[in-house]
């Protein structure tokens, strides 16, 4: 509302303006009369000739001043809270935080998938070209990975409740999305040059032959991995191989998909459809790559279990020795004494299990570290080194299992599993020097293990939820379900409730990775 004093000033100004206008109106009238008389022989003063133009100028200025005062008063009334007869311009509401959060999560998933599939196809390009030719693409991928790692770190901090202020959290989401956009643009910028390097559309026959050779090699490796898994099931408790228990069957599904796609690529090539042949060979490459990831994960699990079994006795001995060294001070502290008694009970139970038959050495190591590790002493000491070695081994095994699951189910796994995996890797990569901070190194290794196991849990839940509605043909037919859940082909939007496979992903960011489209691709419908 305009204050009374200002309203009075505006009225006074308007009154003065009215008087001035009346005065100059009469002056102009008089001048005109005198001028008329002068033309009829009455002498006139030449200075009177200036009165008319000056009067006009003054009147115009007065009108402009009045209009300005009126406009200023109207604007003030409109923008002042409570101003009468006017309403403020509507301000668009801020985007809800949950919407921004969902968008940032989606950007992380899309960027992570783009980085993964770019790395996959870059490996095929390395096999076909020299290091100099793939140099620019390696650099782009390295930059994208760096941006993505920062985005995942920000996501992990948000998930941990940092920062607490919503405005600051919005800023973190904005930076996270910007990092993902930057990573994607970096890969997108190299997509055309990468296609020229591989020249799949010009010469798909060469890539088909290479994929067929890789397929034959993977068939042999999958058979060997199956024998490894059979041995693990016989030698250890079921929990020891549980993270990779289904990997052999999934690897076989990928090989079935590769066979189908290679046949389709050959047929397209014979028909002169090189674009379709190139798209089909990319599907085959993706399937072969994932079969290799699954088979390798089984072999790595076997090696990790064997190493954990070797480390378990020295780990138990290190804990026993350390507890004995501090027996005197433990007896003086009843609360600490109770904790140590529980730790000794765990050690005895682990020894009994390991000598009674099939057991899980990785799980046994974790139990020892969780219950006895806090009181077992300095990991920098020679006998305490077994603590850190066991913790690092457990973390690496958990990271391997989670990464293999995410890498082979990219179409189903969401943001949370990927974020925890990235956090686990960061903890393991930044282990403090054991000479200066041995307890910190042990703590980081155990944190990495916990985060990786959480990542695997989330990934398994995501895959189960993805498959819950059901797809015609089942989950293990090497067809549309395998291709979609694995991210070997991208999902194409459909209006009839179906999941329609689109093209295979390739090197590039979210804007370019879906540039290939095989014709007559299979269609997966939701089960009724």
PLM feature segments, named:
Residues 1-528:
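Long, charged/polar, soluble alpha-helical segments
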